[in-house]
Amino acid sequence: METKQNDAPNDTHKAAAELVARMSIEEQALLLSGDGWWRTHGIARLGLPSIWVADGPHGLRKSPSSDEPGMTSVPATCFPTAPALAASWNTALLHEVGAALGREAQAADVQVLLGPGINIKRSPLGGRNFEYFSEDPLLSGRMAAAYINGVQSEGVGTSVKHFAVNSQESERMSTSSDIDARTLHEIYLPAFEIAVREGQPWTVMSAYNLVNGTPASEHTELLTDILRGAWGFEGMVVSDWGGINDRVRGVEAGNDLEMPGSGDHNRNKIIAAVREGRLSKDALAQAATGVTALVLKAAAAHRPGAHFDAQAHHALARRAAGEGIVLLQNADQLLPVPVGKKLAVIGAFAKTPRFQGAGSSLVNPIQVTNAYDELVALFGAGNVVHAEGCDGEGDTTASMLDDAASKAASADVAIVFAGLPESYESEGFDRRSIDMPPGQVQLIEAVAQAQPNLVVVLLNGSAVAMRWADKVKGIVEAWLGGQAGGGAIAEVLSGRVNPSGKLGETFPVSVEQTPTFPHFPGRDGHALYGEGVFVGYRYYDTRRLQPLFPFGFGLSYTRFAYTGIRSSSNRFDAEGGGSITVDVSVKNIGAVAGQEVVQLYVHERAPAVVRPEIELRAFDKLALEPGEEKTLRFTLSRRDFAYYDARSSAWSVHAGTFDLRVGGSSRDLPLQVTMEVQGRHGAKRLSRQSLVRDFKGLGGGDAHYAELVRALGMGDLLEPAKETPDMTAEQIAAQRKARMATFAFVDEMPVNKLPAFSLGRFAETRLEEMLRRAAS
């Protein structure tokens, strides 16, 4: 059964408002705080039930009781974690996983699933990176929207989190994310915007941190002006658990529900604030209406007696894990390993896999498969031996290393399972380095000396350094692949599944190479986002730095040729409200079927502002049989060419030449089409502090700009330079230099200085009149 998540939202809101109007102030305040850890309050006299919310992003984590924080939970399918799902670049798959999560929530009588987490992976050191999709906002947003639509198609709400600018665990409840407006709007908000516009989640969860000094849970600009005003969010805002600072200010800002419940503590504060006139009755009623509307929507979608097929969900988890596996290295085409070869399977993770992260997302899995057992099933017990090599924490001994090397030497292929132990990455703390445990590195190097045919399989939630990479032939990134990850790994290693995953984050050579290295995680209560918009590949590609593995990268057991590109036009009027299409043809020129993630990036040749070298603007995944060729179509609009102009608080497009580059990763873009884009600044918010150059292009022309230049007595700059035949080349060059310097002086002048610089010719009243005309 599919339930439309947005069926008659106005009717639901109207019914909720009518119900709230019948409530006392005390009852309204009661709704604004949870009943224990996981339930909302009900109001029996009005027939308003209580609903249940539960973690988490990759599997249901329902506590046996709402009075418990969730240290134990009912069994549920543990799907692959967010990085693995994002590496699939498959929105249809995310919808399937979301729908399965929705079915499990319905069966467990859970009305809202607390996910997905879509914070940007600003640094590989982020302790909670295993819960987040990507370093790129488009990939994060599209994965999230598909997941949301899947969950909510089953009549269960989602909670997109953590809003916003929440990319670290260190001092996570007290640190201020200090960020400029352009970076906020270009990097850290778009994933949430896409999720809201394309998925309309039932709830959004505010973050623990402060944003530029204001707690996210009481940030009016984020929760009301942007989320509800600019994006049209129709749902309810809930705090992160324990994330309330000043409850009254939170209600004023648009934070509807406090979780977990605080008893009468904050309820009494709200009631007192209303009675004393510090909080309006309308603000209280609005928040209570948000909670009530959520409850009514959930009650209408509830399916008593719902159940799910655990084996079908396990099979889906296996398929999802397989699509997210990324083949990073395959020297001499060592992979896939033909069945019949002798394998030495090494490492504790081979038998006791790390398949999910730690913290609030921890799922109690229905079952767990491991790669060793799955490889034995495929290759036969006589062809597979195991050596511990190192324990689950990555510690080793000389005897363990000797045993591993000996068994590797007697095999045809050695497979070392390594990665990050739970103690290295978890909710609650950030990583100190991107290095793997030293014992694991020792193990890889010892096995490499004994067996040249070595494959390393990584189980980790974010990027790791690989100083050993040139000593091994194969590297397989399997992430934290969920309860069925072991089977998926075996299928990829044996060739039963052709790997099609692509990295959703850059793997740097070292932590010192990362853009956040000087800033992360911050100090003295402040996290400085000093790298600006240059996050992930935007930084590496702009700086011409070679990472270990680039964003969007992933190998296959087949080969793909990018055979053609064509745009619907070589000119695009960005202000015309239309769009432009780009057709891309790709052919499978290998011997086996495979899937390719086709990625489109935009590059501006001569930007008026500093911009990243390239930015992802579209992607799709194609399945191709050997010899098969397909053409897909991308559609781009104004926003895809725009940058956020903080001075005008608007998305702006400058006229110029743009390249649309297409290929299989951010560093492999063989196809390109070039177009001229006609544009101008967006709707500007001009003030006395605006610069003269900010008046260019207003109303489609430069009349305002010309008026300002003439007011300074420099109207001759608006005319072509007079270059006569009798002038020498040196005189012409000197004149051009002088004009450029004068233009720069004029353009950079704040208009509030014009009355003085014009010696009074440009009066204050004239300036005010021009500002009024420019704003009209």
Language model features with spans:
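A general structural signal for short secondary-structure boundary/capping elements
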Residues: 388-393, 521-526, 628, 680-682, ...
